[in-house]
Amino acid sequence: MSVLLNRDVLTSKIAEALKAGKPRRFRQSVELIVVLRELDLSKPENRINLLVELPHPPKANKIAAFAHGVFEVNAKNAGVDAIITRDQIESLSGNKRAIRKLAKQYDFFIAPPDLMPLLGRVVGPIFGPRGKMPEVVPPNVDVKSVVERLRRSVRVRIRNEPVIKVRVGAEGQDQKEILANILTVLEEINRKFSLKQYLKEIYVKKTMGPPIKIRAVEVLSR
């Protein structure tokens, strides 16, 4: 079910967040923080881990493929940023520092089904808690379409606290595009948890800027 959101309030708060804080020597991201209430996180179904494709991604995500054989060829043709072979996966075994570095280096990973047991054993303990486990691409699925979708996607995740943090824009980006990204994320959250029931508050902020608070009553149209 769709939810009506007050676009004027969101637009005003986006503008306020972009103006707030000191100038930095780098292009800051615009972040959306959604705080939910009365959510029972002892229930596994409430600890979500979703991918949401943004209409206007602030940057193209970096994608790496764990690959071999035909899948390696298809991943290269799809334009992934890096190929990690079976031998390279096995060489990572026990090297926690290298695995952590790899997890930070790329936004998303893809892999064929037959490599998942090895990946679960080698990188799973570090990738899993970080939400970086590879997206499994079955043999009958077009690798290029998966890569293109991941380039535009953000991860919407709830683990131990009822809080979702997502990058929805960047300094210099059209504010209408940032608004469209925020609305897309909120609609996706609403599919899982009714915002009218569970939303407590929202914050919009730059990477190094102060959070601009939006109360649920302000953003939920009546």
Swiss-Prot record:
Entry keyword Iron:
no
Query: Which PROSITE patterns would you find in this protein's record?
Result: RIBOSOMAL_L1 (PS01199)
Q: Which first-to-last residue range defines the signal peptide?
A: none
Offer one example of a GO biological process linked to this entry.
Answer: translation
Tell me one Pfam family matched here. Answer: Ribosomal_L1
Q: Which UniProt keywords apply?
A: Repressor, Ribonucleoprotein, Ribosomal protein, RNA-binding, rRNA-binding, Translation regulation, tRNA-binding
Please provide, alphabetically and separated by semicolons, the GO molecular function terms listed in this UniProt record: rRNA binding; structural constituent of ribosome; tRNA binding
Cellular component, GO annotation = large ribosomal subunit
Q: Which InterPro entries match?
A: Ribosomal_uL1, Ribosomal_uL1-like, Ribosomal_uL1/biogenesis, Ribosomal_uL1_3-a/b-sand, Ribosomal_uL1_arc, Ribosomal_uL1_CS
- What does this protein's UniProt record list under function? Binds directly to 23S rRNA. Probably involved in E site tRNA release. Protein L1 is also a translational repressor protein, it controls the translation of its operon by binding to its mRNA.
Protein family: Belongs to the universal ribosomal protein uL1 family.
Query: What does the subunit comment say?
Result: Part of the 50S ribosomal subunit.
Q: What is this protein called?
A: Large ribosomal subunit protein uL1
Source species, please? Pyrobaculum arsenaticum (strain DSM 13514 / JCM 11321 / PZ6)
Phylogenetic placement of the source organism: Archaea, Thermoproteota, Thermoprotei, Thermoproteales, Thermoproteaceae
